[in-house]
């Protein structure tokens, strides 16, 4: 069995809790079928390194016209699992970012949280008026929209203290997302973030799709240079 540190396990659980995990008397995850391998990877990590009962199940969502299948993992909420749940769940049964976020200090947890709740944008963009192809440097957002702004500030402080990552809070101003707040990494901070988490991102199709703009950024940048007749590095 590969050894992992306590920091890795703790940050993995915190990243999962703040992400897509709903924790009641049992831990529970639910994702679409395209993320089945990711669910299984999480379940395997919990079984291996926490010794908790955890299984991957499958169910059909009858509300979807295309008969989408959903897979989710359940594991008994005992020992450390219960402790970490209590860190971030209030008596009202809702998740909150608390001062315990200071323990979110390993890149594995950050990678998991972005896989759960993040998005990565950037890459080649064509201007159809001029026909020119432009390269937009990748940026990352974490969509922690369920948390109030004052709790997101605590999260920002933890990122700065533990990872030396500087972020901004950006409010959305359109449609159904109006007023929701994203944690935003600018282009420079996104590169620092990627250098930090890349060794900890699982080798899964889902993860490669999530971080695609970062994975192929060198290829894209060189393509634009060739189009413009620039010298390549």
Regions found by a protein language model. Give the residues of each.
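Internal intein/HINT superfamily modules and their associated LAGLIDADG
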Residues: 1-233
């Amino acid at each position: 069995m590969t050894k992992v540190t306590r920091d890795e396990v703790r940050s993995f659980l915190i990243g999962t809790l703040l992400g897509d995990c709903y924790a009641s008397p049992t831990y529970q995850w639910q994702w679409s079928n395209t993320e089945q391998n990711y669910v299984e990877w999480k379940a395997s990590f919990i079984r291996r390194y926490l010794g908790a009962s955890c299984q991957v199940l499958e169910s059909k969502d009858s509300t979807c016209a295309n008969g989408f299948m959903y897979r989710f993992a359940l594991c008994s909420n005992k020992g450390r699992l219960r402790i970490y749940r209590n860190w971030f769940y209030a008596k009202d049964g809702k998740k909150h970012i608390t001062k315990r976020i200071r323990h979110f200090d390993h890149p594995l947890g950050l990678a998991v949280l972005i896989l759960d709740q993040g998005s990565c944008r950037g890459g080649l963009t064509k201007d159809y008026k001029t026909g020119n192809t432009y390269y937009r440097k990748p940026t990352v957002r974490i969509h922690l929209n369920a948390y109030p702004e004052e709790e997101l500030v605590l999260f920002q402080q933890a990122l700065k203290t533990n990872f030396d990552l500087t972020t901004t809070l950006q409010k959305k101003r359109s449609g159904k997302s109006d007023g929701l707040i994203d944690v935003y990494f600018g282009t420079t901070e996104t590169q620092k973030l990627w250098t930090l988490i890349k060794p900890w991102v699982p080798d899964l199709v889902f993860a490669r799709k999530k971080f695609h703009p970062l994975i192929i950024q060198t290829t894209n940048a060189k393509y634009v240079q060739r189009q413009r007749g620039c010298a390549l590095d």
